[in-house]
Amino acid sequence: MPLPDSTDWVEFCRRAADAARDAVHAYGSTAERAVETGRGEGGDTAYVIDRAAEDAVFEEIEALGVPLTAISEERGEIAVGGGGDVRIVIDPVDGSLNAKRGLPFACVSIAISSGPRMGDVEVGWVAELDPRLTASDEPRRGRDWWAVRGEGAFRDGEALAPLSAGPLEVLGLETARPELVAAASSAIESVGARRIRALGSVAMTLCLVAAGQLDAMVSLRPIRSVDAAAAQLLVTEAGGAV
């Protein structure tokens, strides 16, 4: 089932991501961002910035007035307006630990899907956060990455060049907990990459794959839909495989 064309879904993603960005950037120090609020639906520790960003996105969702199903890392699955076939898959802060500590690889991830499968995602939006800054620092808000099925992948409005096959020079590694890296060391070595980068955000790492800045990504445990739904569309629209 196609998405209802009464809504500009790309513009919605832009608004929702900007609102979430502003919510995160309002917490100007590591101490403020590090306040824990419990555990999200996915089981991870939730910080005040996760909740603030999620609340901002849900305000935009509710303003749409469209019956849909929202799936978020913190709240889980929520029927909005009675529920519907349209699904919005949200990770309000992918890379929460980075964001908490003031490291640059963190983002808001929003995917719009017409069905329950990854292959049903029609729009993906990834908005980089810079948690070192406050909302008043507009010129350095972070890059916007997005893709529309059948229309390509973009970074700040510029189309990403199609990906081409080449040597595996730089491999992105996610879920890089020490015990998982140790257990998988032989398998990682057998892949044959010259260098490894562990950035701490699945969505951001996939965006860098889509842009050709990383050659591939491997996760050491299964990836949740909220982490990958938006960015995997960028990879496929840029000509990569997921």
Task: List each model region and its residues.
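N-terminal subdomain of lithium-sensitive/metallo-dependent phosphomonoesterases centered on the IMPase/IPPase/PAP
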Residues: M1-V93
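An extended, acidic
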Residues: A20, V148-E151, L160-V242
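Short, conserved micro-motifs enriched in small and acidic residues
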Residues: D44-A52, K100-G102, G200, S225, ...
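Buried hydrophobic packing segments
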Residues: V57, I61, V108, I112, ...
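Short, Asp-centered acidic motifs that coordinate Mg2+ and/or phosphate
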Residues: T69, V123, D215-A216
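General beta-strand structural signal in soluble alpha/beta enzymes
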Residues: T69-E73, A99-R101, I196-G200
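DPxDG-like acidic metal-binding loop motif
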Residues: G83-G150
